[in-house]
A protein has these predicted regions:
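N-terminal amphipathic/basic leader segments beginning at the initiator methionine
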Residues: 1-13
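Metallocofactor- and cofactor-centric catalytic cores in central/energy metabolism, strongly enriched
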Residues: 4-6, 21-22, 26-29, 33, ...
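Thiamine diphosphate
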Residues: 22, 28-148, 159
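Short, solvent-exposed amphipathic alpha-helical segments in soluble enzyme
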Residues: 39-41, 86-89, 114-117, 144-146, ...
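Glycine-rich beta-alpha junction loops
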Residues: 104-105, 159-163, 236-238, 283
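Conformationally flexible catalytic loops at phosphate/diphosphate-handling active centers
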Residues: 150-225
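Glycine-rich, anion-gripping cofactor-binding loops and their flanking helix/strand elements
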Residues: 217-292
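Single conserved hydrophobic/aromatic residue that forms the stacking wall/gate
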Residues: 305-313
Length: 313
């Protein structure tokens, strides 16, 4: 059924349809409505935690017990939850686990303008980044598939404009899921130094496999344009700004997976245009990765680091 939904409500709907059973979050704009909307579904146990670290640990406990779980917070809350995040990257999960984090470009309700994508790279966990409500719903469901397929928590990065904008979504029924049996595995789940040393290579191999998956994943796509003098790499809200300003004039590489990035796809796209441009909010995250790959491009030398990209475009 087609419905008009806020981005945050669409995330909640995606969690519901994917069979999420436990939600533990700490409130903070622009993430709060995800948990508020989840609380409307009787099939999901929802709670507000004392802080983001506790929320993440509750969700992790539910995952270990075999339930699909979610924890939500705003960008500064991920600082509080960083301790368990980095260790959970090593342990992996049992039931799928999704971590929703909402950035606030423009600081509409926040004390800083940090970019959560750096946490995905540092913690070596995948991150999905929707650009509208339809993708918010779809990516929430996809995040669970990735989590269980690759044995990892998955970050779902929202931002103010996507979280609080409305667009059309297609809803379906909830897919009920049996709990995945817990199997005691001290070497996997108890991160004493001896165990952690053996888990680190597993994490690196997982990142390599995720990068391969990203090369052909439908969340990353090239949209052709008539004029190949300029090619634009973009993501999240910035994709909407680019399409509003440029329409179909220039080819666009729209990245729905913020980490790991599809290097082969990026190189092929760069080779197909005369001038490569990256349009993104907050830090030059994609830009820095492209430059590290040896690609020449225009990025934050043309657009500011601060605020959102709408006015600058």
């Amino acid at each position: 059924m087609k419905q008009l939904m806020l981005g945050n409500a669409a995330v909640a709907r995606g969690l519901y349809e994917a069979g999420c059973g436990v939600v533990s979050s700490y409130p903070g704009t622009p993430s709060t409505e995800i948990t508020e909307e989840c609380a409307k579904y009787d099939e999901i146990y929802c709670e507000w935690a004392p802080n983001e670290k506790v929320a993440m640990e509750v969700a992790f406990g539910a995952s270990l017990a075999g339930k699909r779980s979610f924890c939500g917070m705003k960008h500064v809350g991920l600082n509080v939850a960083a301790d368990p995040l980095f260790t959970m990257s090593y342990t992996g999960v049992n039931g799928g686990m999704v971590i929703g984090v909402a950035d606030d470009a423009g600081m509409h309700s926040s004390q800083n303008e940090q970019d959560s994508r750096h946490y995905a790279r540092a913690a070596k966990v995948p991150m999905l980044e929707p650009s509208d409500s339809a993708e918010a719903l779809a990516f929430a469901k996809l995040a669970y598939e990735l989590s269980e397929q690759f044995d990892t928590p998955v970050l779902l990065k929202m931002c103010t404009r996507v979280a609080h904008s409305q667009s059309i979504v297609d809803t379906t029924e909830r897919a009920e899921r049996e709990m995945i049996p817990y199997e005691k595995n001290i070497a996997k789940y108890v991160m004493m130094p001896g165990n952690a040393k053996r888990r680190h290579p597993v994490v690196e191999e997982r990142t390599r496999k995720l990068a391969q998956w990203a090369e052909t994943a439908p969340v990353n796509r090239v949209e052709e344009g008539a004029d190949h003098k300029i090619g634009i790499i973009t993501s999240s809200t910035s994709y909407q700004y680019v399409k509003e300003v440029c329409g179909d004039r220039f080819p666009v590489l729209k990245l729905g997976m913020a980490w790991p990035l599809p290097e082969g796809l990026i190189r092929d796209f760069a080779a197909s245009v005369d001038l490569l441009t990256v349009v993104e909010e907050l830090d030059g995250f994609i830009e820095a990765h492209c430059r590290a790959m040896g690609l020449a491009l225009a990025g934050k030398d043309c657009l500011l680091y601060t605020s959102d990209a709408a006015d600058e475009l």
